[in-house]
Amino acid sequence: MSKLGQVVEAVEKYNRFVLDQVKRARSDQKFGRELINRWNETMAKTPVTHTPTGLPLPRLALPEIDEPGEIARYLFGEGLPGEFPFLNGTYREMYLEPVREIETGSYGKRASSSGPKEKESGDGPRPPEEPTRLFSGLMLAEDTNERFHYLTQHQRTHRLSTAFDGPTLYGIDSDADGVFGKIGEGGVAIDTVEDMVRLYDGFDLGSPNFSASMTISGPAPIIMAMYIAAAKRRFGPKVVPKLRGTVQADIFKEVQAQNETIFPIEASLRFLTDMVEFTTREMPRWYPISISGYHIGEAGSTPVQQAAYTLSNGFAYAEMFAARGIPVDQFGPRLSFFLDCGLDAEYIALARVSRRIWAIGMRDAFDAGPRGQLFKLHTQTSGRSLIAAEFKNNLTRTAAELMLAYMNATNSCHSNSADEPFTTPSEEWIRLAAHGQAILLEESGIFKHTMNMLSGSPGMKAVERAVEAAILDEFREIERLGGVLAAVEDRFQRSQIQNAAHRYEQQIYDGTRPIIGLNKYRNGEDDAPEIKLARTPRKKQQLQVDRLAKFKKKNAEKAKCALDKLVDVVERGENCFPALLEAAEVSSLGQITGRLQEVVGRFRPMV
């Protein structure tokens, strides 16, 4: 049995444990009184704050129950926000405004037992950062840098999320044959460490108020090495342990949903593990992988498939890192996740259930400590839900998806722009997308006064139960096939995603899935935006090629030595990331990719 099979057993065992605690609370008077006293104490110590109109509200909303069995069901089955099994949130206060007027003390007495293996849970209060993180990347590094400064001009914390162009995603240099017209299209062109310096110019990379997220997987270790090299150029080597951020680096989802993989699967996983081994030891604030369901969802999966494949991929990575000898409490806290949020009913509780399954699986199948149990989540509203027909409706779609994302207590969120069916978003529509989050979190009172404002309804509970059961069924099928890697090689996830995508399109075609303005309530008018499509001017593309040529000429001898050393380390089977760091100082992305492919080969895309 693989670890995934153990996770299924762990969740089933924990659910039985919860039922046992419910029965015990009803039959054991002493235990029942202890639970009632703990519940009453928590409620009594919950601060009371006031809305702008003066209405008093508890800072933590709890169900009004006094029956010991139901208290046990809540404390053990759900947990308070920030407590195992984290159904209601990774941290205690998430999006709440800083405390101003408090009439009572702070809540926080933890349950005396969190399951069959008692461990203190939680990770302290959440850092005071805005959860908004907008995705951006266009033309050359300096153009994206300008957009970054525009997006963060009103934010206390600078949380940048970077999109790369096609050549960069495939590890190809801008001067490669057939690439010229694709430079800077749909993302930023990054060929060298010098580009990386330009990309984040003006930001203090070592500041606790800065973090960078880089959406790239195939050449992720190379891009990560360039980011470290750029940081060292600007701030010196002592900045490395201070760097905060995420690189996506999710090879499994690439093979399952995208095909943006440049090395064979086993080699890709080896390079990833080399990077994780280095960063978890040397960069304690960095997340070296973002286990991503977003692309799985955008490729056409059902919500349950998205969550199941993402979680199973995560457990497979954890098993792989542990096999390398990396301690679970070293890599566990540095794993992060990325999910899509659409409009189907499953999204009401998809992330909540995922958080619970991850916590139980990591604790009971991997023996992870409290910090390694946390499902730290970035959510993005659904790009697939945005359509060109009557495109202004996309504002409402995204607003509804934002509501669902924050109901699930996501740690950070990107809201898509309404004009994305046509082009790389313009500043006008990006501003509206960002303001959508600000209105929800800062202007409205839905999330800023009270934790658990919208959780716990009978409908949400029904969705949670159904989604968890469906995810475990997906786990069982993957386990039957021999685990995640075997299923990937058998194209199982990919074929299931393709089948789901076909059903989705068929439902739109036959009208069983209504899309307002497309197959229902059409007004017949063309309201396409009158905006200029985002294109990289040829002179900018030529500038990128010229810069790259100059860099290669300047570093020709050093690059040869560094690349020879890198190849030697790879052939000896050692951790190649330190050698990759040296190569990133003097070699281009394409040069490094090319030499590594000479050693390990190329990935054959799956269809």
Residue ranges and their predicted role:
Residues 178-180, 299, 394-395, 442, ...:
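Short hydrophobic/aromatic segments of transmembrane alpha-helices and their interfaces
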Residues 139-143, 155, 190-194, 218-226, ...:
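Conserved active-site and cofactor/substrate-binding residues in soluble primary-metabolism enzymes
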Residues 210-216, 299-303, 385-390, 421-424, ...:
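A short glycine/serine-rich beta->alpha loop
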Residues 180, 187-189, 403, 451, ...:
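Residue-level marker of motif borders
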Residues 5, 9-12, 16-347, 365-378, ...:
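Catalytic alpha/beta active-site cores
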